Swiss-Prot record:
This is ATP-dependent DNA helicase SRS2-like protein At4g25120. The gene is SRS2. One of its GO terms (biological process) is DNA recombination. Keywords: ATP-binding, DNA-binding, Helicase, Hydrolase, Isomerase, Nucleotide-binding, Nucleus. It is found in: Nucleus. Its main location: nucleus. Residues 246-548 form the UvrD-like helicase ATP-binding domain. ATP-dependent 3'- to 5'-DNA helicase that could disrupt recombinogenic DNA intermediates and facilitate single strand annealing. Unwinds nicked and partial Holliday junctions in vitro. Anneals two single strands into a dsDNA molecule in vitro. Residues 1-56, 179-202 are annotated as: Disordered. It is an enzyme of class 5 (isomerase). Residues 190-202 have a biased composition (Basic and acidic residues).
Length: 1147
């Protein structure tokens, strides 16, 4: 890089003597052993030029694969008396500058033996060489300033140098074998002479090799003293220098590191990583880099906004605006659009989100099933839609294809994230996976689309296969900074490795906070970085400024149980100890919710302490479904709250608006037209489904688009399939789409277009949304039951897009007048990219409301008080849906532990753990296994750590152990479909249908049998579960199988059919889960079982009453009372009338 300053940390080879081996950097220290190290303090003559140059160099960054280590093994303090006296006599007798033949001299054998002894000595004994002072007063100095270095360099015996070269190389290899790990806090490993002629050893080296065991430096626990470079700070503007001084020593050391050295910053939770990255940017700007040459990459829009804002405060808004701060996908999208022709796409290609990707996978599975059945290759349709119900589906059942697609979606996501191709899958022996992945890629290519993983992989392809693109990126991005490095996938790391091939790269992350493995994140990227950038420097930020000491200690106690992490890390906190961690046992989810509400009211109304607002409180849960009970309860108790977990742009009403806008694009896919017809046709759900299926069938048979088939069908005067009213309503939908197209062509204002299209939603949509508006202050800020807030929310995004992405010139304004709303396409792409974002950068609406969110979505946020609810074994860790286990040594369980670590470190002052004993299905639950990993002196509450450990010990066996022994009889088709043994899928993105698959619901096994005979099955299990000999699920099932065999041998048995069916199903997964459920139930106290039974009876009695009221008409008294309350809604049933009365009475 021409515009970068010279690397002050590397050796200047121009002044190296030609006769000294370049691979051996110890020649200079060896010469220092043969001559006085420095001039006398009273010498007035300057040092020779060569010696000054060698001493002006700074330390180089740590290199794992160094070739020599003598600087740390050879003493620079050899007494002068061990050298031949000819040196002194020669130096005294010849003035500087006189060219006379130098005297010959040899090293004593004692010296050479001393070298060899020092080289092969133990590291502990080596440090003794540094006990002696660096300067010895009895040494002879060169009062005449003669160039000793030149004299010795010219006549040093080359054979001795070669011999010592060989010895030191052997020593380096031996040291590398004995100490494979690198220093936690990187220090120079080569000659580290200071630029000050009076200093011969860097201060940090002296401190590192201090022989006194009582003052050993513990780099994980103590922060090294790193003074700010005065020259660097003086060269910065005042605001920048003040910002650099505000950093702690480790942060400043990371920010001020040599910009030509790859830098790895391991930043623990709350350690100020954003401040460090901003400081790094300021240093890059101060070193002469242009803002446009700096690329900062992260994962969320909120993080990019925060970083840009902080840089703007110190470096100025103009510099902050010119720096490219982008998410991975936004950067890759821009790169792919610039070179779309090289990817066989148009520049207007579509970006498929989660829903469109799922439909494309469904279609890929359908094509594979057809090919397998027909034995021939089926042509790929030019659409990605839900084409399972059309004529092309043949005999493939839509439900079957959709079920398979759920499994294959994990495979495709993991494969795409790791850059796996169909050919690689085929080489691995996964022929089915190769075909489905190939079908999926063909569908995206035919639809001129890419998914989010394709954006990354295609960017890597552009950089690797097209040298001109690589050179363009190298010339543009001369320094790279990466945030949240632990969340990068394999392909994202490849992208970073190519962009940072010039070594000007800084990564910031924490392997203990890697929680997105389900989305392809690979925490081993740190090891890859160490391998690919061997001369890297590593700095660890270990001081937590966020949480109290009790919280930090508890979180550290949990995460240290992970084996696949750097065990030498130790996070500390200088905050107060704070309150102990509260662990509360609750009977069920309603009791848990009531406890949380009482605590919130107590905290916010406590007059004895500074009042805590609702905005300082958060409730974290593992699965989205766990937050619904809190939403309803908070509304009733008028507690303001907001839900981060609801994805705004996945709401149906918003998706309909976006689909109507997409129909104005020439590359609009059929899925958008389907959504519009489904929303605008004023028919019942089944009738609309039949109409859309018929249109799909016609479009497939004619091999035309969905809208073309719909136009032909509804523009016909008569139809043999549809009624006249259906044709009329279909024409109205087509007219509406035509109106939208004309509006976009005519109207220039993006806000006006979006508002008009939103108002085209049918009137019943507006009425339904307004009917359930909650006016008591406890509304959901992101809910789609308030259309006005949804529209305002959407318009706020339009305004933000215009202000940040639309800076037009006069020429562009002239083009805009001719083309109408040319910003619409960019806005839709902007929204599509944000579909996967979980948090808004704008939080002003949520400042005084309790936050309800999943643990995954809480990443990067913090609150004073945090409640982690439903901390049960089947929630945290969330057991795998296929076999209900989580291996202790597997990546799944370690990621679940990291997930809890992230949740705990969101809290500043107070942390609550809550777990339930019975779930909504009356299944007995156990507390999370992670709770027993917290030291008992940090806990307070109903359950101590010993109680938690006792609960786990009383269980029959750990789930993973039992399943592993029972797994020989249980075969899961899903394990054959995926390459990964365990895939951790967060419930944040799971559908409602898949929720039950994750929970250990024992009653699913009973549903295999008729209601009349379930008691036989239940009695058989419960009877033998009471026996002490059958307290393990596998032994209980074996006993039940044996008893069934005996009973079948009895001729007069009445339930032989039931017993045969039961015996054949005992090898299933659900049988094992039911056995666990029965064992847990029998271990409960008798009074607890009686209480649960009464609750069940009351619940089912209430359901029977509601079902009865729901099928009967409202009474005249109910209708009259509703009229007296001012209600104009006609109740559809007695139950509906009862609820309307309650609602209007509350008003």
């Amino acid at each position: 890089m021409e515009n970068l300053p010279p690397n002050r940390g590397m050796w200047n080879q121009e002044y190296s003597h030609g006769r000294i081996s370049q691979s051996f950097r110890s020649a200079k220290p060896l010469l220092d052993r043969k001559r006085p190290i420095e001039n006398a303090p009273n010498s007035s003559n300057p040092l020779p030029q060569r010696m000054k140059e060698s001493m002006d160099t700074e330390s180089v960054s740590h290199n794992i694969n160094f070739n020599s280590t003598p600087l740390m093994e050879l003493s620079a303090n050899t007494p002068y008396k061990r050298l031949k006296p000819e040196i002194e006599s020669y130096a005294d007798g010849h003035p500087c500058g006189l060219r006379t033949p130098p005297p010959r001299f040899d090293l004593d054998k004692e010296i050479i033996n001393g070298f060899q002894t020092d080289i092969y000595a133990d590291v502990g004994s080596l440090s003794e060489a540094f006990v002696t002072p660096l300067k010895e007063p009895e040494r002879v100095t060169l009062s005449n300033g003669c160039s000793t270095s030149s004299i010795l360099d010219d006549d040093f015996d080359d054979s001795i140098l070669e011999e010592i070269d060989l010895i030191c190389e052997q020593s380096a290899r031996k040291a590398a074998c004995q100490t494979p790990t690198t220093s936690i806090y990187q220090t120079p490993s080569k000659d580290n002479k200071s630029s000050d002629p009076k200093a011969s050893l860097d201060f940090r080296d002296v401190e590192k090799f201090e022989p006194d065991s009582n003052v050993k430096l513990k780099l994980d626990e103590e922060t090294p003293t790193i003074a700010a470079d005065p020259a660097l700070l003086n060269s910065m503007p005042d605001e920048c220098s003040k910002y650099m001084l505000s950093l702690n020593d480790r942060q400043r050391d990371a920010a001020c590191s040599n910009i030509s050295t790859p830098l790895m910053v391991i930043a623990g939770p709350g350690s100020g990583k954003t401040s460090t990255m901003v400081g790094r940017v300021l240093v890059l700007l101060n070193e002469g880099l242009l803002p446009s040459n700096i690329l900062a990459m992260t994962f969320t829009k909120a993080a990019t906004s925060e970083m840009r804002e902080r840089i703007g405060k110190s470096a100025g808004k103009k510099a902050a605006k010119d720096i490219t701060i982008s998410t991975f996908h936004s950067f890759s999208l821009q790169l792919c659009r610039m070179h779309a022709d090289k990817l066989q796409r148009t520049s207007e290609f579509s970006v498929y989100g989660h829903g469109q990707q799922r439909r494309a996978i469904i279609e890929a599975v359908r094509l594979y099933e057809e090919e397998k059945k027909n034995g021939s290759k089926t042509s790929v349709p030019c659409e990605s839609g839900e084409g399972l119900n059309g004529a092309g589906a043949g005999a493939v059942c839509p439900e079957y294809a959709k079920d398979l697609s759920k499994k294959w979606q994990k495979f495709v996501t993991q494969g795409k994230a790791s850059g796996k191709s169909p050919e690689q899958c085929r080489k691995m022996g996964n022929e089915i996976g190769a075909k489905i992945l190939g079908n999926y890629n063909d569908i995206l290519k035919a639809c001129d689309a890419l998914d989010y993983h394709d954006l990354i992989s295609c960017s890597v392809t552009l950089l690797s296969d097209f040298p001109e693109v690589f050179k363009e990126c190298q010339d543009t991005w001369k320094a790279i900074i990466v945030d949240e490095f632990q969340d990068t996938s394999t392909m994202q790391y490849k992208l970073l490795r190519m962009l940072g091939s010039h070594n000007h790269i800084t990564i910031v992350g924490d392997d203990d906070q890697s929680i997105f493995g389900f989305n392809g994140a690979d925490s081993s990227g740190f090891d890859s970085f160490r391998r690919d950038f061997p001369n890297y420097k590593e700095v660890r930020l270990i001081k937590n400024y966020r949480s109290s000491r009790h919280i930090v200690e508890a979180a550290s106690s949990i995460i240290k149980n992970n084996t696949k992490r750097c065990q030498s890390k130790s996070i500390s906190s200088e905050n107060s100890q704070g309150s102990k961690i509260t662990v509360k046992e609750c009977h069920n989810e309603e009791a848990q919710c009531a406890y949380v509400i009482d605590k919130i009211i107590e905290i916010t109304n406590d007059g004895s302490t500074p009042c805590c607002s609702h905005g300082d409180i958060a409730i974290l849960y593992r699965r989205q479904v766990s937050g619904k009970v809190f939403q309803n309860a908070f509304r009733q108790r008028k507690i303001p709250f907001n839900v981060h977990g609801v994805a705004f742009y996945r709401k149906k009403v918003v998706q309909v608006i976006l689909a109507m806008l997409k129909t104005t694009f020439s590359e609009c896919d059929d899925a958008s037209y389907r959504r519009v017809f489904k929303a605008l046709l004023p028919f019942e759900k089944e009738e609309k489904k039949r109409i859309i299926e018929h249109i799909e069938k016609i479009s497939t048979s004619r091999k035309c688009s969905f809208i073309s088939a719909a136009s032909d069908i509804f523009n016909a005067k008569i139809s043999g399939t549809f009624k006249r009213s259906q044709l009329t309503q279909g024409r109205k939908v087509l007219q509406t789409l035509d109106m939208v197209a004309k509006l976009v062509d005519r109207e220039q204002s993006l806000s006006a277009v979006v508002t008009c299209v939103a108002n085209m939603i049918p009137q019943k949509y507006l009425l339904e949304q307004r009917a359930v508006v909650d006016n008591d202050g406890g509304k959901l800020l992101n809910e789609d039951n308030d259309l006005r807030s949804v529209l305002q929310y959407l318009m706020d995004d339009v305004a933000e897009f215009i202000s940040t992405h639309c800076t037009t010139t006069e020429e562009e304004d002239a083009i805009k007048e001719k083309k109408g709303c040319n910003q619409l396409h960019s806005f839709i792409n902007y929204i599509s990219e944000r579909e996967t974002e979980n948090f808004r950068s704008r939080r002003r609406d949520n400042e005084n409301s309790v936050t309800l969110t999943t643990i995954h979505q809480s990443k990067g946020l913090e609150w004073d008080i945090v409640f982690i609810v439903k901390a049960n074994e089947n929630e945290i860790p969330l057991l795998h849906e296929s076999n209900g286990n989580a291996s202790e040594s597997g990546t799944s369980l370690e990621e679940e532990r990291r997930l809890l670590y992230v949740a705990m470190t969101r809290a500043r002052k107070k942390l609550f753990f809550l777990y339930v004993t019975v779930d909504s299905n009356w299944q007995v639950l156990q507390p999370s296994r992670f709770l027993k990993e917290i030291p008992g002196h940090l806990l307070q509450g109903d359950m101590s750590v010993n109680d938690c450990r006792k609960v786990h010990e009383n269980l029959p066996n750990k789930t993973e152990q039992s399943v592993s022994s029972f797994g020989t009889d249980i075969k899961h088709e899903e394990s054959k479909l995926t390459d990964n043994d365990v895939m951790n899928i967060p419930e944040d993105y799971a559908s409602e249908e898949s929720i039950a698959a994750y929970a250990l619901n024992g009653n699913n096994f009973l549903k295999r049998f008729d209601v009349e005979v379930r008691s036989v099955v239940s009695h058989l299990f419960h009877n033998w579960a009471k026996k002490q000999a059958f307290q393990e699920p596998k032994r209980l099932i074996d006993k039940v199988r044996f008893v069934i065999g005996e009973r079948l041998a009895i001729k007069k048995n009445k339930h032989k059919d039931v017993l045969r069916a039961l015996k054949s199903s005992l090898t299933s997964e659900e049988a094992f889960q039911y056995a666990e459920h029965v064992l847990r139930w029998e271990q409960l106290p008798a009074d607890t079982r009686a209480h649960i039974v009464r609750e069940k009876q009351e619940h089912f009695q209430k359901l029977r009453i509601e079902n009865s009221m729901g099928t009967s008409e409202a009474t005249s008294k109910q209708i009259a009372f509703l009229h007296s309350l001012g209600c104009t809604v006609v109740p559809t049933s007695r139950l509906h009338a009862s609820r309307l009365i309650e609602q209007y009475k509350s008003l």
